[in-house]
């Protein structure tokens, strides 16, 4: 699903359920400035079991390796209009049962 409203007032770019029934959120960034200027993405973490950054091919992924972007937690997907590849799997951080 795209543009999914969350209870905290944020809106997830993409949200889905994987084959194991886990909730996955993908925050899409198409430009370096968009990626570097996003301070709201941690607000999504309480609403998913796995969180990914979705990027187009060619976008500099170096910022995602810094501690500010939690590389130990957040996965990276690179996609174009035809295909997608998980370059770094997201860590499992199970949702609280109340969510």
Whereabouts are the PLM-identified features?
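A short acidic/basic microdomain associated with nuclease active sites
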Residues: 1-7
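Active-site beta-strand-loop-beta-strand hairpin of nuclease catalytic cores
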Residues: 8, 12-25
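Active-site-adjacent loop/helix micro-motif of nuclease/hydrolase catalytic cores
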Residues: 24-27, 32-43, 61-64
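Glycine-rich, phosphate-binding/catalytic loops in enzymes
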Residues: 41-45, 69-70
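Short, polar loop motifs at secondary-structure junctions
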Residues: 55-60
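Non-catalytic C-terminal interaction segments of nucleic acid-processing enzymes
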Residues: 64, 68-99
